Amino acid sequence: MFDDSPYFETVVKYHTSGRLKVAPEHTEDRVLKLMRKPSFSMFEDMNRRFQQICRREELKYQLIPYFISSHPGCEERDMRALADKVLGKLHFNLEQVQDLTPTPMTLSSVMFYTGSNPYTGEEVYVARSQEEKRRQKSYFFGGTLPEERRRTTKPQPRDTKYKKSNNNKYRR
């Protein structure tokens, strides 16, 4: 699809209304293999081609990638690598973010509930607690954990234009 054939260019030019949503779902090959998805390099190639077409045709379109956190086999270090690649190297502002939701009859759900890969029998790490899931998802938003962001951002000056009166109403 991302070779020199005209198919992708036709999709971008004539069948995209401004935003093309795609689902690479992760960046790390180890996690993508468990998802049964192709390497992230395919998404990078598609992104390059998309940007070339948009520049050449003077289109102001956006590519919107969708990623999943807390997938079986995905550890915190994988989320940090994802953030480094997607937020740092590719400069995407992520909008499509989802924790894994186990659904019936899927390989991901089998791994989620059993903690193992049914094809190999190998143990697979699964983020189960809310804290583990929160920590993984936090990498989508700035590449650091919320407490690390608080330590590195300056406090904002308070707006003293409005003052609270005795009856809890704001006035100038």
Predicted regions and their residues:
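Hydrophobic, well-ordered secondary-structure elements that form the walls
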Residues: 22, 86, 97
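Intrinsically disordered, Lys/Arg-rich low-complexity segments
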Residues: 151-172
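Short, acidic/polar
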Residues: 4-8, 76-84
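Eukaryotic scaffolding regions of large macromolecular assemblies
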Residues: 53-57, 82-83, 88, 111-116, ...
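A structural signal for short secondary-structure junctions
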Residues: 14-15, 57-60, 89-90, 132-133, ...
